[in-house]
């Protein structure tokens, strides 16, 4: 009798041990074991981050060093990436171009972020920053990566393939970042670019957050941009997933209200300007120099080859200036024109100077924030 009891006890012990081993394979483990778990079994934990993926430079270099001409230090590790608020959608990251898929009907939203457009939670630096007072900095090192700094100053780029990433720039100069003619490859990514109102050289004002003085393309993506009068200024470039807001009006050195735009192009461009999946807000009043949210102006030549796609746009005298007579290759598609500042998105309406008969010009599926389709009036 005692041998039967002992044998049953041994079987029970072995069965309990077997169940414990099987249970540990598919639950409670700190490692990723999703490939070993049955569909109907316990939930398996997988690793991953909700932060947006970085372009290649951030994966291969560390913090920028204290010397402007030195190589970035590989020994300083960045702080963990910040995670967007759970109620917000992560930024679009289909490659470094930020190309988003076919837009969903996104109207009647309380804010751009609620409709999946960039806001403060999905733009700007993702790491802890180190204060750095550079003042005016003429960057002359090809391939330099500036990362992890909270810069007080301005960057004037006389070099190729410079990347500014996970950085904040507070400028008191004409611009935050400027690319000089003859140079190429500038990228400004996951950064905040702002200024102190009243401290700039234009009678206290500041003009350009990112300026492209050359003929090469500049990429600006996932950036939080504010204060500057003509925030993103270029004829060619790739502007995607940015949050441009809180432009501050000022009277310039000429004694006039500075005309303000979140994006401005003066025409005569040789390349392609892409403006895709941004939040572009110009709250400047009509009495204080409001021009456009997006201003495509034929100031220095014909406007050509511009894509304005899947943006949240609001403010300005007109929300969009479309290039005027002679403009070609202008594609305006799938944008939301918000009424948050004016019933017509801009103070006088949605669009002016649209050249409907221009070769390659397309206006398609653009809506007000309440869902109404927008059709441009003929250019006078």
Regions inferred by a protein language model and the residue ranges of each:
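Long, ordered, amphipathic alpha-helical scaffolds
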Residues: 102, 107-111, 116-127, 284, ...
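Extracellular beta-strand/beta-solenoid scaffold signature
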Residues: 130-134, 151-153, 171-180, 195-212, ...
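Right-handed parallel beta-helix
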Residues: 143-150, 161-171, 183-198, 214-227, ...
């Amino acid at each position: 009798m005692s041998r039967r009891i002992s044998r049953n006890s041994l079987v029970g012990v072995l069965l309990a041990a077997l169940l414990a081993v099987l249970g540990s394979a598919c639950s409670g483990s700190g490692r990723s074991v999703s490939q070993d778990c049955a569909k109907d079994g316990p939930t398996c934990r997988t690793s991953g981050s909700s932060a947006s993926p970085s372009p290649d430079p951030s994966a291969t270099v560390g913090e920028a060093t204290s010397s402007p001409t030195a190589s970035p230090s590989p020994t300083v590790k960045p702080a963990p990436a910040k995670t967007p608020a759970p109620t917000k959608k992560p930024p679009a990251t289909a490659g470094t171009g930020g190309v988003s898929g076919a837009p969903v009907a996104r109207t009647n939203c309380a804010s751009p972020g609620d409709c999946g457009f960039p806001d403060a939670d999905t733009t700007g630096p993702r790491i802890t920053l180190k204060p750095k007072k550079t003042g005016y900095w003429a960057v002359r090192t090809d391939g330099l990566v500036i990362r992890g700094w909270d810069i007080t100053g301005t960057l004037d780029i006389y070099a190729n393939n410079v990347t500014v990433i996970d950085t904040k720039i507070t400028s008191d100069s004409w611009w935050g970042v400027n690319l000089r003619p003859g140079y190429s490859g500038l990228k400004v990514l996951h950064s905040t670019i702002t200024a102190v109102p009243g401290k700039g050289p234009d009678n206290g004002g500041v003009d350009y957050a990112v300026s492209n003085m050359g003929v090469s393309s500049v990429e600006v993506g996932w950036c939080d941009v504010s204060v500057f009068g003509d925030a993103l200024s270029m004829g060619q470039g790739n502007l995607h997933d940015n949050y441009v807001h809180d432009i501050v009006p000022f009277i310039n050195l000429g004694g006039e209200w500075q005309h303000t735009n979140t994006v401005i192009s003066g025409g005569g461009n040789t390349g392609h300007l892409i403006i895709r999946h941004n939040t572009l807000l110009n709250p400047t009043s009509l009495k204080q120099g409001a021009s456009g949210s997006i201003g495509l102006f034929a100031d220095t030549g014909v406007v050509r080859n511009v894509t304005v796609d899947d943006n949240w746009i609001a403010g300005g005298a007109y929300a969009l200036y479309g290039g005027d007579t002679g403009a070609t290759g202008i594609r305006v598609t799938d944008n939301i024109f918000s009424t948050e500042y004016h019933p017509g998105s801009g103070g006088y309406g949605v669009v002016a100077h649209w050249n409907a008969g221009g070769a390659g010009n397309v206006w398609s599926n653009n809506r007000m924030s309440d869902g109404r389709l927008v059709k441009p009036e003929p250019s006078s």
